[in-house]
Amino acid sequence: MKIFNTLTRQKEAFKPMDPQEVKIYACGPTVYNFIHIGNARPLCVFDVLRRYLEYRGYGVKFVQNFTDIDDKIIKRANEEGKTYQEISETYIKEFWTDAKGLNVREASVHPRATENIDEIIDIIRTLEEKGYAYAVNGDVYFRTRKDQGYGKLSHQPIEDLESGARIAVGEQKEDPLDFALWKAAKPGEPYWESPWGQGRPGWHIECSAMNRRYLGPTIDLHCGGQDLIFPHHENEIAQSECANGCTFANYWMHNGYINVDNVKMSKSLGNFKTVREIADAYGYEVIRYFLISAHYRTPINYNLEIIEQCKSALERLYTCRDSLDFALKNASVDTPDDPQLLADIAAHRDAFITAMDDDLNTADGISAVFELVYDINTRILDNTVSPAVCQAAADLFDELCGVLGILYNRKSNDVDAEIESLIAQRQEARKNKDFATADRIRDELKERGILLKDTPQGVTWTKA
């Protein structure tokens, strides 16, 4: 597998340190609001990455944090007259509702910043001892210029960064480029005891600490949204490598933005759509499909027309898979296997792997699934084939969709049995020329959104 490494700006063969435990860290949400679909893109994309690595035989330790103390959380708590804990707990629960709806698997560990204060303080003290950090009136800052490699992830020379840097009112930095590792407590804000007095951690140091505690000083892969490259990930590298004296992450993956009318979606711009409000209208699975339907590095434009297209694409997949179940149930053991068709079905797996091995190209991976759908529709459902052929197609269909994390809302067996019983009654009525009963059952099914279709194997049904 090759991935585009943001650090080197080129595709590289992915060679983890230990194939039995690939160490991946993904930046999680700052929990002060519902997640919008821009937040959901890395959730779904890197969930597919994890699934695919496991599919290819790797063991994966996947860590994704919650930033549960932050200026935005404190601001929200003050506005609502609540504690920061109440705000963070509320939105962690809401996050899980959305993540489970999107079929995003839980990480191996979901650490919280507030649970890792000791580790954070330990790293800051190490940086201070090495001369990379300094304290001023309870604040602690990182000496950016002392890190000779600073800017290597964002590919920005220090001179360019310098021109845009400034010192805010009340800050006592040595240099405008320096950033906060620890913030002295302000009246009414939450705080922890530290060697520098009461305060709380800066955002960047939280991730460095959780990375080191749960994955060690060097990890295989760090991922997140493109907006995190600078300053967040750049600062993580600086802190971690200066404190630990070794490479922080061997590979970096960043997903592109979601745009609304070609402008980046963000909470600060107020042009965002929450996952929850879109899910209420279209369901979570349509959102997941939308988020993985394009290559993860390309920006994607959000509009209702595209969401409708994704809904239709999913319906095609469900229709095909349900029809395949019916064909399998009615396939005759007397029908011989077709070796060429079996080989052609297997070839779709190769096409899928080729796509996904090329920098997690889910767009081409989905195309491979639809090529399989075409073969199923034209060579299996419209013909008489053996049970082995039907089973091979069904197994591969489930295998590939499982890697993508889609088709997780298939009909329940109880509902299937009830509908198929009604279809059988209708068929019996037609055979007995009781067309009034047959029409009544057909109309009842239609009212429930069930569409019937005659095929060589019998009557199949789908949801409208």
What does each of the following model-derived ranges do?
Residues 8-11, 17-105, 457-461:
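N-terminal, positively charged nucleic-acid-binding surface of large information/translation enzymes
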Residues 66-70, 92-95, 105-120, 137-147:
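Short, glycine/charge-rich beta-strand/loop segments that flank catalytic centers
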